[in-house]
C-alpha cells in the first residue's frame, strides 16, 4: 500500500514538471471585404492571418446586422478553407507553419473565407454591419490590452449602383530580414 502511494506521488510530481505551454494568441489580423454581384447580392471575403505558434483556427461565423438598429439580418457560417503559408522566411528553409521543430521561430498562415450573401431580407435597413470575433488576439498587437479579436465592416446597400469595398494591395505580413532591402507600400 505504501509503495502505491509513493508511486502516485512520484507520478504527480513528474507530471507537474512536464507541463506544456498552451498559446491562444493566434489571431494576428483580419480583413473583411465585399464585391457587389448585383442588387443585394455580395461576395463576402474574410481573410484571417494566424500565428502558427498559436492554437488552430476553426470555421468562421459572420453575423450581419442592421447598423442603425442592431437587428440581426442573417448569420453566415463558412467552413475553414485550407491555409496558405505566407511567412517571409529570410532564406530559412522552413517555417513554424510547416513544423514546430523548425529553427526559424515564426510562421504566418492566411485563411480566405468567401461566401455569397443575399441581403434582400434587410428590408429598409441601408447600413449593414458584418463582423467577426475570435479569441485571442496576438500579444504582438500592442494597440490595446490583450483580449479577444474583433473586426467589422460597414456596407451601405442602398447606394446605387452598388459598390465594392476597398482592399489592400500588399500582404500585411512583414518580417524584416537583416541586410535585405524592405519596401512596404
Q: What label would you give each PLM region?
A:
Residues 1-28:
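Bacterial Sec-dependent N-terminal signal peptides
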Residues 22-185:
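Long, compositionally biased, intrinsically disordered segments
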